[in-house]
């Protein structure tokens, strides 16, 4: 094996160079904007509904600002059918445990899925003004910015699972 690939100092220098390149090319904000699933409290699913604004249909994932229109769980939420996906997600349990956020922010940044996954689910491109709902996760204790990572997207009469591709 080439020593330059295992030398910790060289690896650090390569990472620093890559970070500098990202800053120069303007890609650093995209890297910092992306949150992995482990960043979120996946034990407390939240339900939000409202109108989409500031929609960004691009990678690393589609995102939008959801302007909340109401603060109520739909009576049928726990009984809604959810589509199967490749990842082992217990959708029925998530819907049954869904709650409303405790914080009162009127606008939430919603992280959807990468565009390729949105295409696999055949999600139509969401436009500003579209009515939608999401079930997902925010940071532990609802600390930090009002950001929700969507597990399920409710758009019209369709439900899309966003953790992985359709099963």
Show which residues each predicted segment covers.
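N-terminal secretory signal peptides
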Residues: 1-10, 14-26
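Short boundary/loop segments of OB/S1/cold-shock single-stranded nucleic-acid-binding domains
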Residues: 31-43
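Structural detector for short beta-strands of small beta-barrel domains
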Residues: 45-58
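Short aromatic-glycine-enriched beta-strand elements
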Residues: 58-69
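Mixed-charge, low-complexity intrinsically disordered segments
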Residues: 70-100
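Beta-strand/loop nucleic-acid-binding surfaces
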Residues: 106-120
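Short nucleic-acid-contacting surface segments enriched for D/E, G, S/T with interspersed K/R
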Residues: 119-133
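OB-fold/S1-family single-stranded nucleic acid-binding modules
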Residues: 140-163
């Amino acid at each position: 094996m080439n020593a330059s690939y295992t030398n910790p100092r060289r690896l650090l220098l390569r990472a620093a160079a890559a970070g500098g390149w990202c800053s120069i090319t303007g890609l650093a904000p995209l890297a910092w904007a992306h949150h992995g699933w482990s960043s979120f409290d996946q034990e407390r699913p939240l339900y939000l509904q409202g109108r989409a604004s500031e929609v960004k249909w691009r990678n690393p994932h589609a995102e939008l600002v959801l302007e909340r229109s109401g603060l109520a769980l739909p009576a049928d939420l726990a009984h809604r059918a959810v589509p199967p996906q490749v990842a082992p997600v217990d959708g029925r349990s998530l819907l049954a445990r869904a709650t409303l956020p405790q914080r009162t922010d009127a606008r939430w940044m919603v992280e959807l899925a990468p565009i390729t996954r949105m295409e696999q689910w055949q999600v139509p491109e969401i436009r500003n003004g579209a009515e939608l709902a999401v079930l997902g996760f925010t940071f532990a204790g609802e600390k930090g910015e009002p950001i929700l990572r969507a597990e399920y997207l409710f758009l019209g009469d369709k439900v899309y699972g966003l953790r992985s591709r359709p099963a």
